[in-house]
Amino acid sequence: MVMTDPVADFLTRIRNGNMVMHETVEVPGSRIKLSIARIMQEEGYIKDYEFVEDGKQGIIRIYLKYGPDKKKVITGIKRISKPGLRVYVKKDEIPRVLGGLGTAVISTSKGLMTDKNARKQGLGGEVICYIW
């Protein structure tokens, strides 16, 4: 079966692994998924990630992060721009997730970045997902 939205699958695997308190989650590799994982690590949503070669497309291993008393760091992840309905924003229309407490991942001409970085650089683009 062909996967129509690999990014949504990536986000769903992280969401599901987080809900059942897994330490790690493995997903098929791609450049966009690596960029999203890098942003999630920089913003403090995951502990770490690594790319593992498997002879095909590779695997991204994500180490999920939990706070004291096993409190979840990732409360929610939502896919915004989908293959059937792309969502684009101009530089002055970049959304704030939970009033600035969450993060929007935006695909710009300079690569994937957070909503804060896109606002700072004056770039618009495709809204990939929200993380809070």
Curated annotation (Swiss-Prot):
Signal peptide: none
One term under GO cellular component: ribosome
Name of the protein in its database record: Small ribosomal subunit protein uS8
Protein's GO biological process: translation
Function: One of the primary rRNA binding proteins, it binds directly to 16S rRNA central domain where it helps coordinate assembly of the platform of the 30S subunit.
Pfam families: Ribosomal_S8
SUPFAM superfamilies noted in UniProt: Ribosomal protein S8 (SSF56047)
Organism listed in the record: Syntrophomonas wolfei subsp. wolfei (strain DSM 2245B / Goettingen)
Keyword annotations of the record: Ribonucleoprotein, Ribosomal protein, RNA-binding, rRNA-binding
Assembly, per entry: Part of the 30S ribosomal subunit. Contacts proteins S5 and S12.
PROSITE patterns, A to Z: RIBOSOMAL_S8 (PS00053)
GO terms for MF: rRNA binding; structural constituent of ribosome
Family: Belongs to the universal ribosomal protein uS8 family.
